């Protein structure tokens, strides 16, 4: 009777251990996949991410927003000329150089509006170049080797009793659910950022039309800061995912396996939280509202 019970116990242990190893291997593979996906998506410029959306947004901007920007530009430059004249002692101290100055500022303003898309895309090209260089380093340094990380875990697990193995199997299954949640968080943050990028770029001509005016120019400068914040948010996303991969890489299963699993769970929850903070951190760095 004991022989039969031992065989059942051994079979059940093997089943649980293989399930735990499979869950953890799947987790590490999922992390490698998410790091690669994050690098591929956040390192893409708006025109390369989805050509159809990009062309639609550009068409809306050029045909709908640019005429409005032209009206705003006309109003601002008229106001600028009036302020220039009034500032010179209410026209008593008149200087013809003012007109040349006003013409130059008007020319610069028109240049900003007509080259809006070149300016906006240049910002994202710079950010994309930074992310591309960083992703090459991050992916190479943070790739998780499941075989190396799991090591001799299988032998250690086989030495455990059925009860603790059930607990570890449940915890490792929970890790699979958290890996799925992590995928959702990365999807929301990355794709939400791209949609926000398209929304911000669609109205680019309006803030660009205000760049040369002292009072209204804050709108344009803040818009440029917002663009840089959006662009470099991609770099912060890469940093967050890379830190997570390194933390998981540093978890040692040689001691308490349960503690290692819960540590990994904690890191996963922490990553989900920090991913949603990347936008506010980027805006804080570039002082964008």
Predicted regions: what is each one?
Residues 1-72:
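Binding/recognition "hotspot" determinant
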Residues 70, 74-86, 237-252:
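Juxtamembrane "helix exit" motif at the C-terminal ends of alpha-helical transmembrane segments
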């Amino acid at each position: 009777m004991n022989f039969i019970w031992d065989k059942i116990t051994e079979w059940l242990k093997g089943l649980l251990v293989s399930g735990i190893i499979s869950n953890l291997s799947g987790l590490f593979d999922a992390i490698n996949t998410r790091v690669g996906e994050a690098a591929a998506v956040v390192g893409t410029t708006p025109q390369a991410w989805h050509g159809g959306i990009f062309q639609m947004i550009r068409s809306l901007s050029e045909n709908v927003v640019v005429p409005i920007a032209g009206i705003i530009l006309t109003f601002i430059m008229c106001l600028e000329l009036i302020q220039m004249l009034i500032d010179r002692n209410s026209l008593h101290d008149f200087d013809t150089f003012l007109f040349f100055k006003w013409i130059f500022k008007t020319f610069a303003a028109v240049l900003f509006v007509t080259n809006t898309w070149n300016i906006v895309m240049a910002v994202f090209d710079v950010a994309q170049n930074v992310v591309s260089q960083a992703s090459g380093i991050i992916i190479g340094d943070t790739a998780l080797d499941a075989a190396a990380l799991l090591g001799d875990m299988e032998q250690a697990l086989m030495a455990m009793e059925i009860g603790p193995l059930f607990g570890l199997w449940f915890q490792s299954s929970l890790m699979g659910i958290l890996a799925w949640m992590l995928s959702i968080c990365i999807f929301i943050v990355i794709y939400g950022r791209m949609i926000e990028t398209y929304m911000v770029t669609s109205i680019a001509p309006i803030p660009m039309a205000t760049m040369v005016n002292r009072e209204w120019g804050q709108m344009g400068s803040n818009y440029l800061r917002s663009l840089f914040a959006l662009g470099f948010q991609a770099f912060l996303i890469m940093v967050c995912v890379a830190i997570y991969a390194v933390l998981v890489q540093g978890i040692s299963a040689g001691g308490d396996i349960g503690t290692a699993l819960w540590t990994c769970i904690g890191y996963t929850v922490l990553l989900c939280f920090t991913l949603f903070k990347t936008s506010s951190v980027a805006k804080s760095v570039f002082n964008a509202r």
